[in-house]
Amino acid sequence: MATHKSAEKRSRQIEKRRIRNVSIRSKVKTYIKSVLTAIEAKDKEGAQSALQQAIPVIAKAGAKGVYHQKTASRHISRLTRKVNAQVAE
């Protein structure tokens, strides 16, 4: 347990950020899963619309530091490639 005021404050800040980050990570995973589900169901329009909804959420998580920026970009890139491959079929 923290004994200094600054350590107690830092502990509170860390806990608040952890809770926020868990929420954002869960949201990102949900959006990714919706895109992948649409791809598996061979739903081209559904996959494209799900991707368009997922991209800003993933990008924002990268910008906020929840994910590393390159990790967010990699998620977006891979999802986009999968959707484009399905549309091309």
From Swiss-Prot:
InterPro entries: Ribosomal_bS20 (IPR002583), Ribosomal_bS20_sf (IPR036510). One of its GO terms (biological process) is translation. The keyword Ribonucleoprotein applies. It comes from the Bacteria. GO terms for molecular function: small ribosomal subunit rRNA binding; structural constituent of ribosome. It holds the Pfam family Ribosomal_S20p. GO terms for cellular component: cytosol; small ribosomal subunit. Gene3D superfamilies: Ribosomal protein S20. Keywords: Ribonucleoprotein, Ribosomal protein, RNA-binding, rRNA-binding. Binds directly to 16S ribosomal RNA. Belongs to the bacterial ribosomal protein bS20 family. This is Small ribosomal subunit protein bS20. The lineage of its organism: Bacteria, Pseudomonadati, Thermodesulfobacteriota, Syntrophia, Syntrophales.
